[in-house]
Amino acid sequence: MSAGSGAVREEIAMVTGYPGTDKMIAHVMVTTQFELDGYRVVRTLGVVRGIVVRSRSIFGTIGASLQTILGGNITLLTQLCEKTRAEAFDLMLRHAAELGGNAVVGARYDATEIMQGVTEVLAYGTAVLVEPVRPA
């Protein structure tokens, strides 16, 4: 366990309402489908989610505005979106691990502009416990 992981668990608990976990979450399988090929659902554990609310800084807004003049991909906003989605995804996986799940099925993202320049990104799905299907 790395130094400061207690602080991370406390932050997760404060932000999400569920306790942080020391469990490894890298093994959690995620799919947008409602089943995983080669696995069977042993138990459905419930809806899991990760929510991140992010605002753009004044510098990011100015930089993005300049990029729009030139046209093309607005890399500053693309990077911000990717980082925010990754954080929401990680929180969803942590929630699934805390419930004892090793997979998330029906995974989705949603984004809502809460107010000017402030966006909520939600990653959600159903936490399940799966096991490999054994050939008969």
Identify the meaning behind each predicted range:
Residues 33-36, 109-113:
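Short, solvent-exposed loop/turn elements at beta->coil junctions and helix N-caps
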